[in-house]
């Protein structure tokens, strides 16, 4: 990834900004093979090119799609991605947060939460956060994500998953989630009982 003609901006938005390209300059950005929604890297690149969302597109030796953006195209893709993240958070069934660097997604769980409450949101946010990292100039090999599930009544971390390029499907089963949630509920009940007893005269 060549960042000649780019600069890292200090603008403070909701998420880290995309690379600032000088007018007339372009940047090549490599994308993970999982970011094409059922398309091959070649098909995804061709579609972006046909829609004039990039200057050029090709598949590199590793089989990943590389897109060449100019200043306006990069900003447009970045703005679209930020919009998609905000929409996904707004439409989520339960509270969700994405940090400024887009490398940490936090899901807040209460006693009525089911894992499927987050399933659609999760698919969207993981993909979009990786895109923001790409547009911000983070090299392909350094894009990572931490996924946290926090039990809201106590603030305890239930699960912490790490998604890297080598481990792109850090997953959690329904059974694992339900078992841990039950443990959390029992722990909370025990805590309430202890607090109640300690308040007795």
Model-inferred region functions:
Residues 2-5:
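C-terminal motif of bacterial Sec signal peptides marking the signal peptidase cleavage site
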Residues 9-201:
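Mature, Sec-exported extracytoplasmic domains of Gram-positive
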